[in-house]
Amino acid sequence: MARASPLLMICLVLGSSFATYNLVTMIIHYGSADSLATEDGGLFFDPIVEMPEHVKNTKTSKAPFHIALTATDAIYNKWQCRIMYYWYKKQRSLPGSEMGGFTRILHSGKADNLMDEIPTVVVDPLPEGLDRGYVVLNRPWAFVQWLEKANIEEEYILMAEPDHVFVRPLPNLAFGENPAAFPFFYIKPKENEKIVRKYYPEENGPVTNVDPIGNSPVIIRKDLIAKIAPTWMNISMKMKEDPETDKAFGWVLEMYGYAVASALHGVRHILRKDFMLQPPWDTETFNKYIIHYTYGCDYNLKGELTYGKIGEWRFDKRSHLRGPPPRNLPLPPPGVPESVATLVKMVNEASANIPNWDTL
């Protein structure tokens, strides 16, 4: 039997997504509540979604989740995936963890040399030119393909990224049909209502139904993400094709795509500020679960941040585009935040214990 071409599959996905987009008219009503955030980094409740009081402590059994991250076969992605997988294996078996299986969704279309090291499923990239130079558009397309072909034992899925490091064992932060997500300060649906309304019409409800999130990190029930993923792909591509949206959202366009797609399906997220930290802006790892090292960390020898200027001491993943960072990176000088020092120590531990670290 002949295999359908990637372009045909995309057309089918887009067709079903347009139907979904036109049919979904749900308005989910939530009681108002004041924003709550615990000083010790616990639950963060936004007026958008609040977990009802009577279910906060009713969890009686484990609900394992499958970890899935999308990646390319670029060396830059490979060394990050190796570090991420190392810490997943260390944290998975510790008390408090509900981490299940692991899949690297490789959207380069062909196998690479990490297939035997990291559990991997190969999917097709978008046809050439369709991403318009925005490689992140491959992420929703990768999830669409993976969800169609994968046999996932767990009921929940954590959507993660290569530059995530698990600081401690991660429990399932979702509750039933409410996924758990990290609130990003720069995702602002209300401030961008004029643009958001192009994809989330008024008849669907208030723009505050669109959560201030991206697709990662998110822990979500697999039947929900299976419904959302085609719409996420469709909306993201429509956003990229619209010059006004593309200019306004830039590199976070696909994050808005996921947020809008979720809202179109009536899915609301429990917002967890303790889900993740991002050095150097977040200075402590206490009570946090994931380090996201997306920002460069630059300091002088006095331990002062020199962001925007290359520091006398620095750690920036972009310094290692062509190969992995060397083993035993120098630790930051005194005065640098604990989160930065912890990140470097964790990178060093992983690189010291991963065989053939320098050969990618």
UniProtKB/Swiss-Prot annotation:
Q: Where in the cell is it found?
A: Golgi apparatus membrane
Q: What GO terms are given for molecular function?
A: hydroxyproline O-arabinosyltransferase activity
Topological type in the membrane: Single-pass type II membrane protein
Output the Gene Ontology cellular-component terms: Golgi membrane; Golgi trans cisterna
Matching entries from InterPro entries are given as:
HPAT-like, HPAT/SRGT1-like
Task: Give the stretches traversing the membrane.
Answer: 13-33
Q: Give one Pfam hit by family name.
A: HPAT
Q: Which reaction does it catalyse?
A: trans-4-hydroxy-L-prolyl-[protein] + UDP-beta-L-arabinofuranose = O-(beta-L-arabinofuranosyl)-trans-4-hydroxy-L-prolyl-[protein] + UDP + H(+)
Principal place where this protein is found? Golgi
Its Enzyme Commission number(s) read 2.4.2.58
Enumerate the UniProt keywords alphabetically. Glycosyltransferase, Golgi apparatus, Membrane, Signal-anchor, Transferase, Transmembrane, Transmembrane helix
Instruction: Briefly state the protein's biological role.
Output: Glycosyltransferase involved in the O-arabinosylation of several proteins including extensins and small signaling peptides. Catalyzes the transfer of the initial L-arabinose to the hydroxyl group of Hyp residues. Probably involved in the arabinosylation of CLAVATA3/ESR-related (CLE) signaling peptides that move from root to shoot, to interact with SUNN receptor kinase signaling that regulates nodulation. Involved in long distance nodulation signaling events.
Record's protein name: Hydroxyproline O-arabinosyltransferase RDN2
Which species is listed as the source?
A: Medicago truncatula (Barrel medic)
Source lineage? Eukaryota, Viridiplantae, Streptophyta, Embryophyta, Tracheophyta
- Its gene is RDN2
